[in-house]
Amino acid sequence: MNVVRLARLVGPIMAKQKVGALVNISTFGAKEPSLSFPISSVIRAAVSSYCKLFASELGHANVRMNNILPGFINSYPADKQTINQIPMLRQGTPAEVAELASFLLSDKAAYITGQDFVIDGGLTKSI
C-alpha cells in the first residue's frame, strides 16, 4: 500500500524531528463496504487500521496520521439517484475536502491522531 510506503519513508524522519502530520485520502467505503467495490472496501479498511497502528507507534514523537473518508465529490459525476440518497442532496467539493485536510495538518489539530473523518453530506449510516 502506498500509505505504508510513504509512512515508512517519512515517519522516521518526522520522529527524529519530533513533529509531523500525514493525512490519507481514502473513501467512506472504509466504514460502509460496498458489494460493487469489494477489494477497494477491504483495502480502505486496512488503511484505517494502519493509521491507528501508526498513531500508536509514533504518537510519542508528536507524529500524527489521520484519514479523510470522502463520499461523492463533484470532481466525479454521480447520477441523480445517488445524489438523492445524500441527506444534503448534493455532492461535496474538492475545496471542502481540502479544508478538512488543511485543518488536520495544522497545529490546531495537534491532539488528533489515528482517526477517520467522514465527509459525505450525511450519507454514511455507520456509527
What do the predicted segments below correspond to?
Residues 12, 56-57, 110:
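Alpha-helical segment proximal to the catalytic Tyr-Lys
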Residues 23-46, 51-60:
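Catalytic loop of short-chain dehydrogenase/reductase
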Residues 64-74, 105, 118-120:
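Conserved SDR Rossmann-fold cofactor-binding beta-strand/turn motif
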Residues 7-8, 52:
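A short, exposed helix-loop element centered on a Lys and neighboring polar residues
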Residues 32, 102, 113-127:
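Short C-terminal tail/terminal secondary-structure segment
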